[in-house]
Amino acid sequence: MSGMFITVEGPDGSGKSTQLQLLVENLKQKGYDIVVTREPGGTTVGNQIREVLLSPDHHEMTPRVEMMLYAASRAQNVEQVIRPALERGAIVLCDRFIDASIAYQGYGLQYDLDQIRSLNEWATNGLTPDLTFLFDLNPERASARMKDRGQLDRIESRDQAFHERVYAGFQTLLKQYPERIVRIDADQSIECIQDEVLDYTIERLQQGGVQK
């Protein structure tokens, strides 16, 4: 595959989705072939799974089922969207990927990390991002931002202890994969973050020889 696979991660409320859209716009203006997707979602099948996963009506969902639904959405996204785009040389920008499952289901719900990794290895046929931006925002600030947004989904509405475990999970991943995961201070202004993310992305694209 000759494209580049870039993911954004971070706690709910970190601003990662806003920054992803800004990065998409900036790269398109520079002439790059961009495909943008998200998880859960990104496909018709994935979007239906997303509705089930995030609906507050499904409070009885078990950690095992939650993990398997995320992996199912991810498998469809990889086969239908991500891998074909990479094979044609596009840059794929994805809002969350396997790191999110490790942080949210593994650390947040305290589900077995080895099982999560094994399931997702199979679901994606071993696909790993080339670059991941982790938007780092402490749980208290993230919680305040989420409350300002209004109604919360099933995941966002979990207690503060859950979100603190998720945050700790992301910090662990940052230490485990320093060559892939780049920490972004999400408490800066939108403009400062935008510039930092774009500069780093362009540098990595040039290093990787990705063509416009």
From Swiss-Prot:
Its EC number is 2.7.4.9. It holds the Pfam family Thymidylate_kin. One of its GO terms (biological process) is dTTP biosynthetic process. One of its GO terms (cellular component) is cytosol. GO terms for molecular function: ATP binding; dTMP kinase activity. It is an enzyme of class 2 (transferase). ATP binds at residues 10-17. It catalyses: dTMP + ATP = dTDP + ADP. Keywords: ATP-binding, Kinase, Nucleotide biosynthesis, Nucleotide-binding, Transferase. Phosphorylation of dTMP to form dTDP in both de novo and salvage pathways of dTTP synthesis. Belongs to the thymidylate kinase family. This is Thymidylate kinase. It comes from Exiguobacterium sp. (strain ATCC BAA-1283 / AT1b). The lineage of its organism: Bacteria, Bacillati, Bacillota, Bacilli, Bacillales. The gene is tmk.
